[in-house]
Amino acid sequence: MEKKTVYNITNSIAISEEEAVNCNIPEVNKAEINLSQLKRNFDIIQGFLKPNTKFMAVLKGDAYGHGIRPIAKELINLKCDVFGVVRLIEAFTLRKAGIKTPIMLLAPISPSQAAWVIRYNIIPMVDSEEIVEALDQSASQNDTIVKLHVKINTGLNRYGVNPENAVKFIREIHEKYLHVQVDGVYTHFQDPDYNPDFTHKQIECFNNIIFQLQKQKLRPRIIHAANSTGIIRYPEAHYDMVRCGTLLFGLEHEQGQRNMPKGIKTLMELKGRIMKVRTIRAGEAGGYGSTFVAKKDSKVAIIAFGYGDGISRGWKEVLVAGKRVPVVNYFMDGLMVDISNIDETVKELDEAVIVGNQGDESITWLEACKSLGSYVDEQIQCITERVPKKYFYEK
């Protein structure tokens, strides 16, 4: 596959993005992020939606480790309607990047943060009168009206107003506060992949609240419930808007229970340079702690991708010269792999693939995370800042 690199983002501690674009920094490893695949994923997901259903791209956790600013800018080109984040700092990052798209906070704020929500034109989630009051007071001081979304707790039991109090809570906001407006109501599923019976109970509970709001002429403009799994498996829960995170980035669950739609793929591949090739004699140890002792004369390679870059101990295999090779030792700045069974000449600065394709072989995120007992969306966010991100379109 031919690639056209559009820009690089290198360690922000050492160098700015602008500098990274204009100079060729020697790199020993990288995360390659395929923006063409992002568009394909976006288009495939849109195919599940009815016309006029709004699309919220959930970009929490630095866009699931993919880089919140470049991903958001690409999604603007794709006509994404709303961005969802969890921390105020994520919303500030987008606004500071010049992004005007509506941004919604999917977790509660503290009263002291109300002024910042208004200053940066962010849509807050509320589930307590204390927050509504703080928003109303701050909005009054700024002579504006804040549009907010009320979260309903239908079973996840993290945030949200309990169902028996939801209609009363929303009605009182309408009656008591002049500078806030309930623009949306939403809920979040507890276990849509593995427990459809409970998910349907959540939908039924949520529908009952919507019905009561309609009867009292309190139905807000935007109703939403479906997350990534909900988009695929619960079309009755699409309502006015869907929230999409892991599916947009092609991140499967540990057992692949989601049944990913055809064509949805991950965007990110991880690659590292071979920094040293050497022979270890039979009986000698390689790396810290003598965890690897050669049973015979063995050729090993040191790859510049260690747990300081976000690779967990327990990573089983990588690709060298298009073949799978076992990882035999881990350290902060690299991996030691046994390349004794590779016939081809392997030399220093050759590229190894940690996750992705090389030749006819591939290692997927799902495969790697199963061996670690981890989740893909958990592991991919472990990749650290010192790994340069290279964004590209397929030619």
Swiss-Prot record:
The active site is at K60 (proton acceptor), Y288 (proton acceptor). CDD domains: PLPDE_III_AR. It is an enzyme of class 5 (isomerase). Keywords: Isomerase, Pyridoxal phosphate. Pathway: Amino-acid biosynthesis; D-alanine biosynthesis; D-alanine from L-alanine: step 1/1. The modification N6-(pyridoxal phosphate)lysine is found at K60. It catalyses: L-alanine = D-alanine. GO terms for molecular function: alanine racemase activity; pyridoxal phosphate binding. Pfam families: Ala_racemase_C, Ala_racemase_N. InterPro entries: Ala_racemase (IPR000821), Ala_racemase/Decarboxylase_C (IPR009006), Ala_racemase_C (IPR011079), Ala_racemase_N (IPR001608), Ala_racemase_pyridoxalP-BS (IPR020622), PLP-binding_barrel (IPR029066). Its cofactor is pyridoxal 5'-phosphate. GO terms for biological process: D-alanine biosynthetic process. Substrate binds at R158, M332. Its EC number is 5.1.1.1. GO terms for cellular component: cytosol. Belongs to the alanine racemase family. PANTHER family: ALANINE RACEMASE, ALANINE RACEMASE, CATABOLIC-RELATED. Catalyzes the interconversion of L-alanine and D-alanine. May also act on other amino acids. This is Alanine racemase 2. It comes from Clostridium acetobutylicum (strain ATCC 824 / DSM 792 / JCM 1419 / IAM 19013 / LMG 5710 / NBRC 13948 / NRRL B-527 / VKM B-1787 / 2291 / W). The lineage of its organism: Bacteria, Bacillati, Bacillota, Clostridia, Eubacteriales. The gene is alr2.
